[in-house]
Every structure is written in structure tokens, then in C-alpha cells.
């Protein structure tokens, strides 16, 4: 006679283990999620306190001192744009930006177009009875404070407006309107704009970032009415950079530096182009097809400096003002990087100068698309 005993079969045991594992894993995930939420909540609380403290500090300063280094406002002294605060072993980055704003309550400033006025003069339209043009468009300052953790995650953000304690008077300053587009005419958002003028007091060296419309507006700049002293540079990751230049006699720049009169504005549009690192391969041969080694190749092109069709000056020129011509290797090959997309010319305007092997000048017989098998292909 066989005696039966209570217990679990192997199948029942396996099912039980699976169920228990699921419950344990779910509990662990829940615990981890709750722990993560608690940590995030604590850090957001710390970040909020840091942002509030920074904002209160900025608001306690005299109005004329509300400007950050590398920012959009000209001043004689500057606040640091970023600070690192360590709380309970965690590093937080506190970033402050300060810009001017034009508000329609006392009229709008001088804008290049009605569309820009409606878009960038806050609270447009102006109330009845306000002046047709606000001669001091820098009505107040907008302070923006953000706090991020080391991963770059934004944990807190605050904004406020700060106005001067004295009555607004007509200014002895001007404004620059800068638009950045790509080569298809589309606005480039996030481009860095730097504006300098070493002939004003104080010197101007301010920067800002284009908005979604590719626009930067810089208010309250000191006037500079002659010799085109305001130099403007536009740059962006993955794009070419472009800097304005001054007229040369009767030659007018394609992208001109600016004069700026008091109580007026200047407007400039800059075109930057998407580009890659590897730009051009030159394969140099003689008329028999034999490679020319040690040949220095003169190349110019890209952005045209001046508008006159008779002038052939370009931003990229590897012989002037300094000689940086590439030299071909034993296979007659040379590579050039970081060229702006556009037209390029070889061996001078007529193909007769500055392509040399030693003291021997070689004339350009033909420039044809690269047909070799070198892995560094042109783009």
C-alpha cells in the first residue's frame, strides 16, 4: 500500500517561483521608480532655491550693472553668465541671461519693417497718444535664470522684467537688427551672433543667439557713425561662419560692417551654409596625365567679398594675405578641408599664376571633376 503525502509538483513549484519573481521584480521596479522620483523632486527643490536666490541677487543690483559677460548688453562691468553650485555633493549649473526689451507702452523703436515691429515690439500695437517712434527702445531688461544638473537636464527656470528707477529719456544709442539665413533663404535658429566695436567707449563685445526666425536684436549700442566700425560675426555648429567687412574705396561689401546713428537702427542679413569637414581633393597632373608632386596649388572662392562683378576678391584665398597653398603628394594629390560651399578658382583668375613646382609656374589647362578612387571623396 502506497502512502500519499501533501506537497507540490515540479510544475506547481516552477509556476510559484515565476509568480514570486514577477512580484519581487515589480516591487523592485516600483521601489526604484519611487526612489528616482524622490531624488528628482529633491534636486528640483534645490534647483528652484538656487534659481530664486540668483534672481533675487540680480534684482538687488543697480540697473546699469545688469549685464552678463558675453551677453547682449554693453556695460562697464559684467556678471558671470554661469555659476557652479555644489549642494549635498551634487553640482548644479546656474545660468543667467539678460536682454533688453522694447515695449509698445511708450511707442515702438525704429524697425527696418512693419512686420518686424509687430513681431518684436512687445504688447503691440502702441496705445493711443504714444509717440510714433520710441527714441529709447530699450524699455526694460528681461532676466532669465536656469538651473541644470551635470547631465544638462533643466531643473528650474525663472524669468522677470527689471526696469530702471529713473524716468526714461531719449537715448544716445542705436539698435542692430541681425538676421541669419542659410543658402536656401531659410532662417537659422540657434546661430551665435558676436558684435564688436573697439572704437566706442566702452568697447562693444556682445553676443546673442538667433531665435526661431533667425533674428537677433541688440539695443542700446553706442553710436558709431563713420568707417563701419561695427563688425558682426555669425556662426553655428555644422555651418560656415561669416564676418562682415568694411568697404574698400568704391567697392561695397557683400556683407558689410555697420555704422550706427543715435536713435536709429541698422539691419544686416548674413548667409551661413551647411558644410562638412572634407571639402576638396585636388589631383594635379601634367598634360600627359603624369602626377605632379610637390605642386603648390593656388585656390580662392567661397564667399565673394564685394558686390562688383569686376572684382574677384573672395573670403577664401590661400595665397593672400598669407601663403597657405596645399602641396601635392607623390601621387599629385592634395586635400583641403573646411571650405564653404560655392565656386572656386584655381591658379588665379586666368589660371596663370601661383600654381608652382619649385620655381616653375604651371598654367591651368583644365579643371575637371575628380574621377579617382581615393577614399576622401569631394562633397
PLM ranges: what are they?
Residues 225-233, 341-348:
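A short tyrosine-centered beta-strand micro-motif
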Residues 199-220, 304-335:
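Short, acidic Ser/Thr/Gly-rich low-complexity loop/linker segments typical of extracellular
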Residues 8-52:
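Aliphatic-rich helix starts adjacent to a transmembrane/signal segment
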Residues 1-8:
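N-terminal leader/signal peptides at the extreme start of proteins
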Residues 42-184:
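Low-complexity, Gly/Pro-rich coil/beta segments used as flexible assembly/activation regions
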Residues 169-183, 267-287, 296, 300:
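A short, Gly/Thr-enriched small/hydrophobic beta-strand-prone motif that recurs across taxa
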Residues 235-268, 326-327, 346-379:
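Structured interaction patches on ligand/partner-binding surfaces of diverse proteins
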Residues 184-203, 287-319:
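Short, ordered, surface-exposed loop/turn motifs in non-cytosolic proteins
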